[in-house]
Amino acid sequence: VLIANSRGGNAVRNYLQNGSGAGKVSHAILCGTPNHGVFADPKRAPNAEFNGAGAFLMGLNAPQGPNGDEVTPVVKWMTIRSDNNDKYAQPDGAWIGAKGMATHVTFEGPALKGAENVVIAGIDHRETAYSAKAFEAMFRFITGKPPVSLAVAPEASVVLDGKVSGYFAYAATGAVPTNLPLVGATVELYAIEPRTGERVGAAVHSKTIVADGAWGPFKADPQARYEFVLAAPGYATTHIYRSPFPRSSGIVNLRVEKILDADKDAAAIVIMTRPRGYFGLPRDSISLDGKNPPGVPSGVAGVASSKLKLGEAASRPVLGTFNDERLIGRSWPVANNELSYLELTY
């Protein structure tokens, strides 16, 4: 079974149609994949991977079999899409840097003839893969029955691990994030007080990163909130605050951050981020430090982080909320090359 989100679906389709994968895969699930492009214009970037009128996608979408399907035979296919809230399936080019341009792509762009095409109202581009409703659709498709529960089942013993990465410097584009181990970085974990974000005692875990990139394993208290403190030469000391972890995970990946030149005028920086989804207004109830989150527009959900620049350097609690999830962290002084992240789980 192969499950892919967004661009990953292009790789899955190419592997099954043009590689050797069709005989090895029973089910393929494409979540928010721009199967007909983020735009479709033969005169605009004709060789682009995301051009629905380009050679790559037209080749993948060429009719197959007696019904003219757009999917490789033998494999069972499902697509999951939003009704109208996927930033990359929009008739206007606003989310691809071309506001006012007709993309010639519709909300139905991720659907494929010959697949089971699932539409979930209101979900955003990332939630096509990472939401509970998307999981329910996937589970039914693979097993033929509904999941017993969509709630996260807690474990009595929780072990956490993941990789620590950083940035790679390109002369042309500047620093870009990588998934490569950041050897020599250090990680410390602190249990924190759930109302103030203050540390409770000494570090409960610490490690210097070696070639495998792993910062764990760490046996966590499933009721506790933790502050992850990352440091490495050439980087800012990065404080990441997380909600409790009810289950074990080996993919709690961490990245040491840098402070942008444009942000060095702030006394402190707190960024609330949602890696597994976007912020949508008025769809979601969101606040950062008791106010509307900066930089989150109304309409289609397409922004996954909100940056708060504080005028005071003194450390203090900062609360972030997203629907039912509540994150508490603390601010740290930019003058000491430090910044904070409130990373949402859901």
Language model segments and positions:
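Serine-dependent carboxylesterase/thioesterase catalytic core
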Residues: 1-72
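Short beta-strand/loop motif that positions the catalytic acidic residue
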Residues: 79-81
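Short, proline-enriched alpha-helix->beta-strand connector loops that line the catalytic pocket
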Residues: 71-76, 113-115
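Beta-strand-rich domain onsets/edges
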Residues: 139-159
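Acidic catalytic loop of the alpha/beta-hydrolase fold
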Residues: 36, 83-95, 125
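Catalytic histidine-centered segment of alpha/beta-hydrolase-like enzymes
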Residues: 122-131
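Preference for solvent-exposed, low-hydrophobicity sequence contexts
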Residues: 165-172, 189-346
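Hydrophobic beta-strand segments
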Residues: 175-191
